[in-house]
Amino acid sequence: MVDFATRVAKSFKDKVSGIDNKKGTDIQGVLGLDSTPNVLFASVFAAGGGSYDNFFYKVENGRADFRNFANKGTSYKNLEKVYNDYKNLIGSNGLFASKDGSYSSNFEKFHQLAFYVGSSSGYNYAFADETAKRLKFGDSAIEYPNDTLEIKAPTNNSQSGDGNGGTNNDNLLGTFDIREKSNGKKGESNGKQGNGQDKKTISLYKDSIPKEKTEGTDAILISDNQLINQLQTAAKTSSSQNKANTAAITFKQSNKSETDQSTTSQVIGYTTTASLKADKKNIFDVKKLNNEKSERKIIVGATVETLNQANTLQANEAIIKPAPGKYQSTDSHKVMITQGPNIVGIHANEKEDKETQKFINWYLNKEESWSVQNSGSTTTKKQTAAQYFAEQSSYITPLKNNFKADQSATKDSTVNTNYFTKQTFDLFKEVNDGKVLGFNDPSDFRSGKFRNTIGSTFNATISSKVDFNKFFENFKASLGSGFER
């Protein structure tokens, strides 16, 4: 896989630009890696015959033993081979490594990567709809986030609420609309219209919020001066454009039409609760509403670009294969990384142990009614909590009974409708049958730092292009002490 990607990158040098001058709308490379720690761990584990004795570390008696790594044993030698193979791809500008939330699928779906290695959990974000949208700012672009709402400029009819029925808009920066359940119970503000929902306007203010408004309920206070300036500038621009449009109305139109035209709100930004990294240039953190679980962002200085199917990747076009289970064809065992939440029982006392057992029984066996989003509409589905969680997360429920049953009959419905989980199901079945080795990071209190550090150090080499000795030196220095044994 790495060799093929390297050959492609070398064959199309003019299409794969260097890292220093790569724009967000350019081709990002040939091969994308969503998790470099996963790739390095799986490769070294497979190259070591699928044995933890040949891995960076193993856990014995609850503590990790790093001597194989520290003493430059088999894991060091295998890491050197893996690194040098990837270095050839890096030198050809053919590798993209995800960071800061920019997953490979964000570029793959817009034909900016040839292929990538990711997780089954990314299925819902891996493909474009029939018409996909992007937000562009300068040379950068992001996919139009889920749950995104337009921010409208203040209009002549906007009420800042000075308490005396005035219309002083000095503090009002803009507004956006959310949808709430019509029974009065507050729902998640996802902006989606549907039956049983009422529109509610949220106002954005600078300096202070009028006394008849409540922060977190129908108002948000903006404190970042750069964001305030950008919203105000966008509002002034839209106001000028609106006046020009009004002046162009012919005398044949009624006064009512002129009034309607002059009070039409213009889009000055966007707000979303999707997972985005604030850059304080175009994407800003703001306070969330009281009923929201996710952090809220405001996006400014962006234009919307709509792409048709010819420019995007749909699910029925993709070739989906399991990630390579061997680093070299001569490796003795095929390996699959298994990641996801684990249920860990911790003994407390007899009463709490019984309650934990009740929860596990409910989680795995008791069917409940769940609200499920499907093609823009909400339906109710009878599932166990485990099945619901797996379906919503694009995971599978790896129970032995599921693997014994005929795949088409399994209750884990995502197996039949989700291309990623079908592959994952088949691989887990091979693990269950002993044909594939399932790999999980051995863990103690140091393993998280080891994983994060090897990933960040490797990602840095995409621009630095250092040799293995320098990479290893940087890795050891970033790790610090505590990994000698």
Swiss-Prot record:
Q: Where is the composition biased (Low complexity)?
A: 155-174
Chain residue ranges for the region called Disordered: 151-201
Q: Name one Pfam family in it.
A: Lipoprotein_10
Task: Write down the InterPro entries for this protein, in alphabetical order.
Answer: Lipoprotein_10_C, Mycoplasma_lipoprotein_cen_dom, P68-like
Q: Where is the composition biased (Basic and acidic residues)?
A: 177-189
Disulfides per UniProt: none
State the similarity comment: Belongs to the MG185/MG260 family.
What name goes with this protein? Uncharacterized protein MPN_147
